[in-house]
Regions:
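A structural "domain/chain start" motif
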Residues: 7-49, 53, 60, 65, ...
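Aromatic side chains
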Residues: 12-14, 32, 55, 79, ...
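Short, exposed beta-strand "edge-strand" segments with a Pro/Gly-rich flavor and a Y/T-containing core
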Residues: 15-17, 126, 152
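Soluble non-cytosolic domains of exported or imported proteins
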Residues: 38-46, 92, 96, 132-145
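Conserved small/polar residues in nucleotide/adenosyl-binding loops
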Residues: 147-154
């Protein structure tokens, strides 16, 4: 399991409302699936575990397997490569990896806060590196975007 050391400021804010711990006690995070045209078989399970880890470590919510007061689920919908910095010999010296995750957030206590939204992050890396060497950073960025997102603004 990857230890996720986020650099983002966690605000626990979804759709304009902070978590009310007097009403919301539990969260269910369903396994994210990989629906991208290109599939890295380890990415979805790792993303799910990293997301669970953040909630366990940085909220007072109890993680439960089903019927949580809050529920997160979704799928990886994009895992895309693009050549960057093409050299004179027509070989790219850098590659851009973009990961997109669609997330559905449900609040059983306050359904007005429910939303579905896609989050993306990309990183350029030297073409001699493996994509897995930047995946962790991209997943961390997407998790930070999810936390700090105010879906009402989108």
């Amino acid at each position: 399991m990857t230890v996720l050391a986020t650099a983002c400021s966690i605000s626990y804010k979804f759709n304009g409302a902070s978590i009310d711990y007097t009403k919301v006690k539990t969260i269910t995070i369903r396994d994210f699936t990989n629906q991208a045209p290109y599939v890295n078989p380890t990415l979805a399970p790792q993303f799910t575990e990293d997301l669970k880890d953040i909630y366990i470590r940085q909220t007072r919510l109890q993680l439960v397997p089903s019927n949580g007061d809050l529920e997160l689920e979704g799928e990886i919908t994009g895992y895309d490569f693009a050549p960057m910095a093409v050299k004179e010999d027509a070989i790219a010296s850098q590659t851009r990896l973009t990961i997109t995750v669609r997330v559905r957030y449900s609040n059983r206590v306050n359904p007005d806060e429910d939303f579905e939204q896609s989050f993306s992050a990309y990183r350029e890396f030297d073409s001699n590196l493996m994509p897995q060497q930047v995946e962790g950073t991209l997943c961390e960025e997407i998790i930070c975007l999810l936390y700090t997102s105010d879906a009402a603004d989108d």
